[in-house]
Amino acid sequence: MKTLIIHPEDSSTTFLDIVYESIPNKTVITGGVSKAQVQQLIREHDRVMMMGHGSPGGLFGVGKFTNCGAYIIDQQMVPLLKEKTDNVFIWCNADKFVDVFKLKGFYSGMFISEVGEAYYCGLPGTEQEQVDESNYGFVNIIGKYINEDTNTIHENVKNEYGLIAESNPVALLSLIHI
């Protein structure tokens, strides 16, 4: 299976690299290509993993891609993504994007990856250590199961990340949206 990973280069999301480090036969795109080139790469791969910062409208390109506007993954990509069943969508509110367009795969909702996001989501007093525990726990669990089908990934993330959420309010709030 050929996997395309679209992970716009951004120092605040480098922890996500852990998710795909054990995937064989992968192509990692962090920027420097156009939206049309990304579309062609999606066609050439069996599975697409998209991760970074985003919104219900898609995955932000964070200025790393050419001719793409704000989003590198948006509704223009939906017809191609619908052809795949084991996609991975990890960005804030990816669940809304997946639901609206009836896509298939593993996805996150409002995932708190920074202290500022924790404050914004009603967790004042959040410490960086809590965010780090949540972030690294999440990606290590996903990374452990990433070569399985998306139902297995989802089931194991819910169970194992749930253990972290028992003592970590950041993980608890993020878990609700997985």
Positions of PLM-derived features:
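A domain-level signal for caspase-like cysteine endopeptidase catalytic cores
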Residues: M1-M51, V88-A94
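A glycine-rich, hydrophobic loop/mini-helix early in the fold
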Residues: H45-F65
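Helix N-cap and loop-to-helix transition residues
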Residues: S34, I73-D74, D149
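Polar low-complexity intrinsically disordered regions enriched in Ser/Thr and small residues
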Residues: S34-K35, S55, I112, G125, ...
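Conserved small/polar residues in nucleotide/adenosyl-binding loops
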Residues: I176-I178
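Intrinsically disordered, low-complexity, charge-dense segments enriched in Lys/Arg
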Residues: P124-L172
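Catalytic cores of nucleophile-dependent amide-cleaving enzymes
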Residues: E9, G61-Y136, I141
